[in-house]
Curated annotation (Swiss-Prot):
Belongs to the isocitrate and isopropylmalate dehydrogenases family. LeuB type 1 subfamily. One of its GO terms (cellular component) is cytosol. The record marks Y139, K185 as: Important for catalysis. InterPro entries: IsoCit/isopropylmalate_DH_CS, IsoPropMal-DH-like_dom, Isopropylmalate_DH. Pathway: Amino-acid biosynthesis; L-leucine biosynthesis; L-leucine from 3-methyl-2-oxobutanoate: step 3/4. The keyword Ion transport does not apply. PROSITE patterns: IDH_IMDH. PANTHER family: 3-ISOPROPYLMALATE DEHYDROGENASE (PTHR42979:SF1). The gene is leuB. GO terms for molecular function: 3-isopropylmalate dehydrogenase activity; magnesium ion binding; NAD binding. This is 3-isopropylmalate dehydrogenase. It is an enzyme of class 1 (oxidoreductase). Catalyzes the oxidation of 3-carboxy-2-hydroxy-4-methylpentanoate (3-isopropylmalate) to 3-carboxy-4-methyl-2-oxopentanoate. The product decarboxylates to 4-methyl-2 oxopentanoate.
Length: 347
């Protein structure tokens, strides 16, 4: 079987971290004997420069036909038109592909716990995933307005929107340590009451998964004081936005964190959580590990290459443990040197 992969290098450091990652993918495919077809398209700010839009119809159609999308990074101060920003392309892509679930792993190995801003004995062994609903909730609710003396946002969820994200979280927990924490604000919000009800209903289909309901304020505290208690966390859009950013600092650098966006079926999108960092673009300083770990997610979730994903993750964590890192992690290695060493593991 041959997989179709679309590469979207994007802006800033995106092209340099993705190009090295694609070279790794080629070596991994040769070792693990799978085939893929690769297409690359301009996306984000660079697409605005070339075509006047952050997402062309050709690029969108290519993405719709893909098994997986690998995205570098988008955005930067160069593109200031509020009606034609690079980020609009990503929002349109997510909506067109119905990517309603954002998956963000947070992992701290014994050898990397010293990088965390938290105490080592607190973070060591952290291995959690936050599943965030991505396309509904207060960010998309109507009516929404700002007037001179008042403003309104609307928080709305349907049972179908809740159930589909909850099932993705249950399936993920079922493959991991079988612990699911559902985060809401059930003591105050009507939408959270429905959320909790749906979680309890869906639980009947997953008898082996232990479910714990937690209020969002309590969860935000426990993420800092006892992150190792969590396996899979599922929550709505606003809470997930905040909690996933909070969790992302636990490993010690935004450059370490991968992410994925899933729909019910079809194409899945993989990207590091960091921005385009235009201040260090083309300076060979970018931390590539978030992009490389996003490839590992892609190998596992879209290409059915679990062994390859596990090996790649182990190699990255061994590099961190031995301080083969870029400056943001306290190392002295350039981006190109990291990729050279990574590729040598497959030669």
């Amino acid at each position: 079987m041959s997989y179709k992969i679309v590469a979207l290098p994007g802006d800033g450091i995106g092209p340099e971290i993705l190009s090295g990652t694609l070279e790794l993918l080629k070596l991994i495919s040769e070792k693990y004997h799978f085939e893929y077809h690769l297409e690359s398209h301009h996306f984000g700010g660079v697409s605005i420069d070339y075509y006047g839009t952050p997402l062309t119809n050709e690029t969108l159609q290519s993405c719709k036909n893909a098994d997986a999308i690998l995205l570098g990074a988008i955005g930067g101060p160069k593109w200031t038109d509020p009606n034609n920003r690079p980020e609009h392309g990503l929002l349109k892509l997510r909506k067109s592909l119905n990517l309603f679930a954002n998956i963000r792993p947070t992992f701290v190995t014994k050898g990397a716990s010293h990088l965390s801003p938290l105490k080592q004995d607190i973070v060591e062994g952290t291995d959690l995933v936050i599943v965030r609903e991505l396309t509904s909730g207060i960010y998309f609710g109507e009516p929404s307005y700002v007037k001179k003396t008042e403003a309104l946002d609307s928080l709305k969820y349907s049972s179908q929107e809740i159930e589909r994200i909850v099932r993705i979280a249950f399936n993920l927990a079922n493959r991991r340590r079988k612990k699911l924490t559902s985060v809401d604000k059930e003591n105050v919000l009507s939408s959270s009451k429905l959320w909790r009800q749906i979680v309890n209903d869906v639980k009947k289909d997953y008898p082996e998964v232990e479910v714990n309901h937690m209020l969002v304020d309590a969860c935000s505290m426990h993420l800092i004081t006892q992150p190792t208690q969590f396996d899979v966390i599922v929550t709505e859009n606003l809470f997930g936005d905040i909690l996933s950013d909070e969790a992302s600092v636990i490993p010690g650098s935004l450059g370490l964190s991968p992410s994925a966006s899933f729909g019910q079926t079809g194409t899945r999108l993989y990207e590091p959580i960091h921005g385009s960092a235009p201040d260090i673009a083309n300076e060979d300083k970018a931390n590539p590990f978030g992009m490389v770990l996003s490839l590992a997610l892609c190998l596992r979730e879209s290409l059915n290459q679990n062994d390859a994903a596990n090996e790649l993750e182990s190699i990255v964590y061994s590099f961190i443990q031995s301080n083969k890192t870029t400056a943001d992690l306290g190392g002295q290695y350039r981006t190109s040197k990291i990729f050279k060493l990574l590729k040598e593991k497959y030669l």
